[in-house]
């Protein structure tokens, strides 16, 4: 409206006035998105970390929504500074939806093409399949961070709510250690597994109870000013924001590959019995978290821990305890969650086909990650 008023003063003809206003607004949007990206990448915590922020987009079809999405992708494609460095944050996540951007006649198909071009140059955005997220989590939402998903939830009025909800924390289970302690005995494995799940349950419940001890004045922006979706008074209980499964709390896990290697050898990925064993692990975790959620009134979910540092830490600790074991501790890392062993260099189709059965049991957090050669000459 501001630019249109200026155009009416200096430009003749309604069509030219509208074109002028749109071009000026388009530049404002680009500058705003560029400022946001630079601001996030020059903001650091006391220990030198950049805030982990995530932008989800792809679905908005009105003029402003489309221009914002274009600007986000143009800024990321251009890169940071004179060196044109690839920005890590904010993490970009593009949603693919039938009727919106999947096919050539969809209104946002051109933005999807822009997203593909951006991905060939910057490895971002990540991609979400709208229908699959609804199927797995109960409603559509982009993840918190890179893979943490809220589950579908309705308030007391029957309204579906995602904004303002939160995760209260994660406790991660070292699956390879259980397998090593069992010495390849399936019965021993499941007995130890049950014992460790009980410990995880206690830790998660403690986490919830400890969080409930906060008061709204401890974090006014979150509790009193609406960041968590409601405005609490100074004396209100913060549990009002957590209970009735509004908040999630997550049971993480790591190292399905190494655990199965103990029982079936290093090349077990094509062994149906071994695959069923790993699926049983996450299936049992899912059954436990569902039961805990019904017992305590908070949404316990299974989470495929990203564990950039935990892959090293768990493996290092187990090397000290069990020594160097071929294909397990000798790598000096554990494989993330349900991922395919990267040493085998599977192509993207093999990797996704292998991993696709797991997210139904760990919808609290999952990601399929593939590395590609230079695709700039072949975006299709």
Where are these regions (language model features)?
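Conserved catalytic cores of very large enzyme subunits
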Residues: 1-245, 266-267, 271-380
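Contiguous, well-ordered alpha-helical segments that form the cores/surfaces of helical PPI scaffolds
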Residues: 249-262, 283
């Amino acid at each position: 409206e501001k630019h249109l008023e200026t155009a009416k003063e200096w430009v003749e003809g309604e069509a030219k006035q509208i074109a002028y206003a749109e071009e000026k607004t388009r530049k404002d949007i680009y500058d705003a998105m560029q400022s946001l990206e630079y601001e996030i990448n020059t903001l650091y915590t006391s220990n030198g970390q950049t805030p982990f922020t995530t932008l989800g987009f792809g679905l908005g079809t009105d003029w402003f929504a489309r221009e914002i999405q274009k600007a986000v992708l143009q800024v990321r494609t251009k890169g940071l500074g004179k060196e044109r460095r690839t920005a890590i944050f904010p993490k970009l996540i593009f949603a693919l939806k039938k009727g919106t951007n999947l096919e050539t006649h969809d209104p946002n198909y051109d933005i999807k093409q822009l997203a593909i071009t951006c991905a060939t140059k910057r490895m971002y955005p990540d991609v979400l399949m709208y229908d699959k997220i609804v199927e797995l989590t109960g409603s559509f939402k982009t993840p918190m961070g890179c893979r943490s998903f809220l589950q579908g939830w309705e308030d007391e009025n029957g309204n579906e709510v995602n904004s303002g909800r939160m995760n209260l924390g994660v406790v991660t289970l070292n699956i390879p250690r259980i397998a090593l302690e069992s010495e390849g005995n399936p019965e021993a494995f499941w007995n130890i597994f049950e014992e460790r799940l009980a410990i995880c349950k206690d830790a998660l419940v403690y986490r919830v109870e400890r969080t409930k001890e906060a008061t709204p004045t401890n974090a006014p922006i979150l509790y009193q000013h609406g960041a968590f979706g409601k405005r609490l008074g100074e004396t209100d209980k913060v549990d009002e924001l957590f209970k009735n499964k509004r908040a999630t709390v997550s049971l993480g896990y790591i190292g399905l590959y190494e655990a199965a290697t103990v029982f079936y050898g290093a090349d077990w990925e094509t062994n149906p019995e071994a695959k069923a064993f790993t699926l049983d692990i996450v299936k049992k975790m899912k059954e436990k978290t569902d039961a805990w959620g019904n017992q305590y009134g908070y949404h316990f979910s299974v989470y495929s821990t990203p564990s950039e540092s935990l892959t090293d830490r768990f493996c290092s600790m187990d090397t000290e305890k069990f020594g160097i074991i071929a294909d397990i501790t000798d790598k000096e890392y554990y494989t993330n969650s349900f991922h395919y062993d990267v040493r085998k260099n599977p192509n993207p189709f093999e990797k996704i086909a292998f991993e696709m059965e797991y997210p139904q049991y760990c919808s609290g957090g999952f990601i399929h990650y593939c590395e590609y050669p230079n695709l700039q000459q072949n975006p299709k």
